[in-house]
Curated annotation (Swiss-Prot):
Residues engaged in binding substrate: 133-140, 269-273
Residues engaged in binding NADP(+): 43-48, 170-173, 193-196, 211, 251-252, 336-337
Protein role: Dehydrogenase; part of the gene cluster that mediates the biosynthesis of nigerpyrone and its derivatives carbonarone A and pestalamide A. The biosynthesis pathway begins with the polyketide assembly by epaA to form phenylacetyl triketide precursor from successive condensation of two malonyl-CoA, presumably with one phenylacetyl-CoA starter unit produced by the phenylacetyl-CoA ligase epaB. For the nigerpyrone biosynthesis, the reactive polyketide chain is released as an aldehyde through the R-domain. A nonenzymatic cyclization and dehydration may create nigerpyrone.
Annotated protein name in UniProt: Dehydrogenase orf1
Assigned protein family: Belongs to the zinc-containing alcohol dehydrogenase family.
Top-rank taxon: Eukaryota
GN (gene name): orf1
InterPro entries (UniProt xref): ADH-like_C, ADH-like_N, GroES-like_sf, NAD(P)-bd_dom_sf, PKS_ER, Trans-enoyl_RdTase-like
Length: 346
């Protein structure tokens, strides 16, 4: 049996410590993956700093991390989509389950079968690792019935005639959401910084607007004139003012437009939600418990192989080995734009 090592959080607001960890076994509908690349996310450092204040069920020591790409080494009972030796990309849910065997920051991790996709050989592990958490967040907001409930993506989509607003198109979630919404048959209008306009349009957005412009709400209102709105997905960073502006702009746009009146939020709802409009905070991990994960992680493998889905944003490899994960988290706290920080494992 191989030896497993993990970057462990010993306690609340403590730095990661690399040490030997139990070698995991594949339970029912689960696979064990040898991690070749992992990405870091804001939820990782937030959980590291805040622990049970953020997630009351968290106990220590804990292995954090959500995004991995690697090779299947074992499959559990009931697994039909994978076999040992397969290349995969997947969303590790250890923070949600409070199960360190399912945390990404280690050499061998347990994944749910329905939270993983086959990885084509043409796509490097380090670039694939940017996808999972952002993908899960996007599919919850876009396709779960208790959120926007949009039509499911296809390699040959049927046009719906509706237009979706995605605020934050150059974020990791935004890059996934644009592609998914277009593949589901929706026109996408998005916001981002001007230097990312080409990026979001290359992913399928028909128009992009500068979210920092004082006229942004008027610009969006004009862009949606005469269109049927499919609702909005509001994605923003950790700065409270930016998050509030994003939520309010999306809610107001949906309220003023013809069409659906729902906004999926990556931030808490503001105090004054317009009459007739509904909104809900996105919990990405909820997708593991419903049909959307089966449908969309199945679609992801097909779309990656077909070349119709791009692993975006760009991966920036900031180190090699588990010892580099803490540095990656520290760098992420300083802020990044249109890229995702990745650590490779030898």
């Amino acid at each position: 049996m191989p030896t497993n090592f993990a970057a462990i959080v010993p306690g609340k607001n403590q730095s990661l410590v690399v040490q030997e960890a139990p070698y995991p076994t594949a339970g029912e509908n689960r696979i064990v993956v040898r991690v070749h690349a992992l990405a870091v996310n804001a939820v990782d450092y937030a959980t590291q700093m805040m622990g049970e204040t953020l997630f009351p069920w968290v106990t220590y020591p804990l292995v954090l991390g959500e995004d991995i790409a690697g090779e299947v080494v074992a499959i559990g009972p009931g697994v039909t989509r994978f076999k040992p030796g397969d290349r995969v990309v997947g969303h590790a849910v250890g923070t949600n389950s409070n199960n360190s065997a399912e945390g990404a920051f280690q050499q061998y991790v347990v994944l749910l079968e329905n939270m993983a996709s086959p990885l084509p050989h043409a796509l490097e592990y380090q670039q694939a690792a940017v996808v999972p958490l952002a993908f899960s967040t996007a599919i919850v907001g876009l396709f779960q019935k208790d959120y926007l409930g949009l039509q499911i993506p296809s390699l040959t989509p049927t046009r719906t005639g509706k237009t979706l607003l995605i605020w934050g198109g150059a974020t990791s979630v935004g890059c996934n959401a644009i592609q998914l919404a277009v593949a589901a048959g929706y026109e996408v209008i998005t916001t981002c910084s001007p230097h990312n306009f080409d990026l979001v349009k290359s992913l399928g957005a028909t128009a992009a607007f500068d979210y920092k412009k004082p006229s942004i709400r008027d610009d969006l209102r004009e862009a949606f004139r005469g269109k049927t709105c499919a609702g909005a997905l509001a994605i923003a960073g950790v700065v409270p003012q930016t998050r509030n502006e994003a939520a309010e702009a999306c809610l107001n746009l949906v309220a003023e437009s013809e069409g659906d009146k729902f906004v999926a939020l990556s931030m808490p709802a503001p105090p004054n939600v317009p009459d007739g409009v509904s909104c809900k905070f996105i919990f990405a991990s909820t997708v593991k418990d419903n049909e959307v994960s089966h449908q969309l992680y199945g679609y992801l493998g097909e779309a990656l192989a077909h070349g119709s889905f791009i692993a975006a944003p760009e991966a920036e490899v900031v180190g090699t080995g588990l010892e580099a994960v803490q540095g990656a988290l520290n760098a992420l706290k300083q802020g990044v734009s249109a890229k995702k920080l990745v650590v490779t494992l030898p």
